[in-house]
Amino acid sequence: MPELPEVETTRRGIAPHLEGQRVSRVVVRERRLRWPIPEDLDVRLSGQRIVLVERRAKYLLINAEVGTLISHLGMSGNLRLVEVGLPAAKHEHVDIELESGMALRYTDPRRFGAMLWSQDPHNHELLLRLGPEPLTELFDGDRLFQLSRGKSMAVKPFIMDNAVVVGVGNIYATEALFAAGIDPRRAAGGISRGRYLKLAIEIKRVLAAAIERGGTTLRDFIGGDGQPGYFQQELFVYGRGGEACKVCGTELRNVVLGQRASVFCPRCQR
């Protein structure tokens, strides 16, 4: 599933080609995504100029002069730029055609993504209760410490809770916990403030590094420019269960937390 770095990579790839451009038409070949694409999307968006492309958590917000297209890539979706008129392959469900001669093409084999329209996106029900962005000053170790008090749940699903902080998905939670030396099974409420300060720093570092390297391509993610991400080459623990820890050589262990697979080093993480 595309996580925050992959979505931010997509935003950075498509924004220069969209911002300031006018939409000539919207071609929808399949409306049945996680939520149906609005029947009147073409009417609402065509003729409008795209003002700004933003990201909120794992949602892309394509802001027009009036209204905003909210897009989510789901489990395996992607957005990329193609030339208008390029024949669509299977699973290529939407083209937003621009007067420049380019089109933003949405591909989603599993159809778990979304394309919705809103006049007030930040108050949309999907975005309204989201926590702070992890790479801003609104997120820090003190927030983690305060929100974790009294919680018996494991720390990994705690930091993956979008009400606590957005965009810390399975890959990056696993890597940040390793970097901070924290066992992902440890109760969130039993971790000290000092360790949370360290964890917040590592969450920011890991996410920033992944964005810089274009995200993590583990299966089928490609960025808005059609290129894969390269952060998978720097993964220390994610997907490496049973292999030797790159730091100490101990065999990495697999565990399931919050219905998600996780990997950790029993020696480096306490």
From Swiss-Prot:
Positions that bind DNA: 91, 110, 151
Top-level taxonomic group: Bacteria
Entry-linked Gene3D superfamilies: 1.10.8.50, MutM-like, N-terminal
Cofactors demanded by this protein: Zn(2+)
Note on how the cofactor is bound: Binds 1 zinc ion per subunit.
One example of a Gene Ontology biological process annotation: base-excision repair
Pfam families hit by this protein: Fapy_DNA_glyco, H2TH, zf-FPG_IleRS
Active site location: 2-3, 58, 260
UniProtKB keywords: DNA damage, DNA repair, DNA-binding, Glycosidase, Hydrolase, Lyase, Metal-binding, Multifunctional enzyme, Zinc, Zinc-finger
Quaternary data: Monomer.
Biological role: Involved in base excision repair of DNA damaged by oxidation or by mutagenic agents. Acts as a DNA glycosylase that recognizes and removes damaged bases. Has a preference for oxidized purines, such as 7,8-dihydro-8-oxoguanine (8-oxoG). Has AP (apurinic/apyrimidinic) lyase activity and introduces nicks in the DNA strand. Cleaves the DNA backbone by beta-delta elimination to generate a single-strand break at the site of the removed base with both 3'- and 5'-phosphates.
Protein family: Belongs to the FPG family.
Protein name (Swiss-Prot/TrEMBL): Formamidopyrimidine-DNA glycosylase
Lineage of the species this protein comes from: Bacteria, Pseudomonadati, Pseudomonadota, Gammaproteobacteria, Pseudomonadales
